[in-house]
Structures are given as structure tokens and as C-alpha cells.
């Protein structure tokens, strides 16, 4: 079968000598996001410098995870990234991978050996939030998690990413080798701390002396990652094949924008990713708050009020000038003042860029999808900024309409009387409230959900008054008119 290796392509393959690469990074979780983000940054560094930092890719799960590793091997570890802008698409053939491993092919031992090699300086992860096996309530490692139980009983044949890291560090300690940096690249707040808690939790349960050695010798930098990478579908893969002239089963599409902010805290060296657009900083948290409030907060605002206004995607929503203007005003007038950013951060440029990203029609980001799980997203994205304004006397009418938009959305019926498929862990509570209350009484009942609003906001007369008024306006006039009136 013809692959991207042997074909004439309309795009250049990597021109550097692949043999110069060393597997100095072992990456756990070779999913779409990693291939469009960290592996791409590393590729651009290889392209523009004489760096030798290559990646040994590891997938741990059966099924599609194994198929991807097999497909990568069939095409010499090359794959295609399609960066889809509003006007055009740029194709890139990425060549930063040196090896690709899977336990069903290489055994646990093959993966642990790679992690325990002297040249391995970083073990990075994109394993999603559940890959850290944390207890939701305490944030500590869940020792009853089936994968963790298995890894405690079979420490030399682990199944979880955390189990592999702890066993590999034990092997390095035994061999007298320097530790590696554990770098989480998951879209989780303070991800380095989350990784550290999990690794130390398992090490402590295995051997307190090992845990003490890890605490002393391993660093867990936090990172903030940003790029919209929709899950690869047969349609997107075929679309890329049509442009490329050959089928690449590992191909992925993404937006042109990418951002990577990394806490500069490495124990055993690191690539100069800052030469290709990443930022090394002392503290990632301000950048996480910037993303959470300005990007995610305005995304939620557009999702609820856009869906109610009859728009299917975020890009459709911001074709309406009133929505576009309101999202920008929310970011600059109400979210930006709540942030404490390092000197030189241009929040106006960031907000302008976000509006441009939201407007990209080739990324069909559905309002319904972003509206999911609002009970978990609302507190961080919209309610915490409101609290700061209530303390400091700032204006927050866009935030009030955003909260009211969520309340109106959870009624489960749109402005035309059609059912809304509300997806939320608290759906049963919403349905109970919907059956008993309407109007201002419904607002009061929703404010009684302390898991969302805590105890302070329902006691604040200004908050209750503003949200109730915004909700009643939405019910009477509809979302489009309310957004236009802001």
C-alpha cells in the first residue's frame, strides 16, 4: 500500500537526517492533541536548529491506541498535520518521532527499558484527567482504582501511566542514573501538581524510601497548552488524503493557533522549545487563569446565548456583530480586570486573537458541545470573576447575562419550543426544579444548588437581583435581543 513515505507529495517531508535524533523524551499517550502540539513544536525545533531531541512515543491502551502505533511504524513514524485556517489549509509532515511502542507489541519491559535509558531526560504525558487516577473528592491518588490496584500487585508489569513512571524511576534509582522530569501536557489546571500527587501517592504505597527519592530528585513542571484539535474522524482523514494525494491513517486536523507556556523547572535538561514559539516562565498559573476566564469564559457565554439564539457553532454565533462585540467586551471589560499577569502581557491582543479563532468556520465547534457540563464549568469561568467584581465594585452585566443564559438553557426547551439535550451531571436536579418552579422562583431554586453557587452568592442581593433580571429579560425578549442590548 502507498504511504506518505514513498509518494510524491505536494508538501515537503522532513529534510534532516533522522539518525541524529535521540529518544530523549518518552511520551505517554500519543493522541491527536500531542501529535498536533508537543510533537509539532519538537518537529519545528529539529527543522530550525541542530537539536537531537527526538520522541519515543508510547500508547498503553488496547484497540485504537495499538492500531495507531502500528500505522505510524508502517510510515517510518511520519504523519500529517493539517492546520485549517479560515481561508486556507497548510499541510505539514511531522518527523519528531524516533520510536513508537505498545505493551502488546514491545511488552511492559520494552517500555520500562526505554524510560530507564540514560539518555531519557523527560517523560511527558497526555493521558487526560482520568489517567492520573485521582479521587475526585480529595484530589489524592485513588488506591481503589482498578489500574492502581493492579500496579501495586504487579509493580514490574504496570498498566497505568503513573505505574510506568514510578517503576521506571525505581529502575533509574537502582542503576544510579539521574532522574527524569515528569511533564504533564494535559489540559488540567496545575497539571504538574496533579502528576506529582499521583506519582508520589503510588510510590509511597509501594516504598516510602522510593517516594522520598522521587520527591528530592524529580521535578513536575506545570504547563498550559492551547490548540483546538478536534478528534480525527474518517471524514477529516479522507479530506486530508484528498489534498495530500495519499491516505495517511495517522493524519489530524487542527487550527493554526498554538500556545504552550511551560514552568522552567527541569531536572535533566530540556529542548529549546522557546525558539519555536513556546514560553518558559516561572509561574504558569496566571496564564491558566487568563485562558480559563478569557477563552473558556467567553466560550461558555457564546455557547449558551448562541444556542438559544439558534446558532449551531461558535463560528456561526460570532458572525452576528452583536455577539462578537459582546464576547470581546466580556473579555476586556469584565474578565481582564480580574487577572494578575506578568508585565508585558497584551490582553487586548489576546482577546482579538480569540475572536479570530472563534470565527474560524473550518473548525465546527458546536455550541451544544461547549454547553455540556455547565454545572462544573460555571464556577471557575463566570462565578469567580463575579465574586471579584462584587468585592471591588466593577461592572459585570455580561457575566450576569452569561449566568442567566446557562439558567435559561437548563430549562431544556429552546426559544422555539424544541427540546434541548442538556448533558450535565446535575441534570436530575435541574429537571426537578423545572417541574416545580418558573420565573424568579426558578432562579432562586437554581441558586440554591450550593455545588455550583456555594453559600455566598445566593445571599448577595446584588447578584440575585442582576441574574434574576437578566433571566426574565431572556425569557421575554430572547437571546439575540438581549445580547444586542448589552
List PLM regions with ranges.
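Substrate/ligand-engaging "lid" and interaction regions
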Residues: 1-486
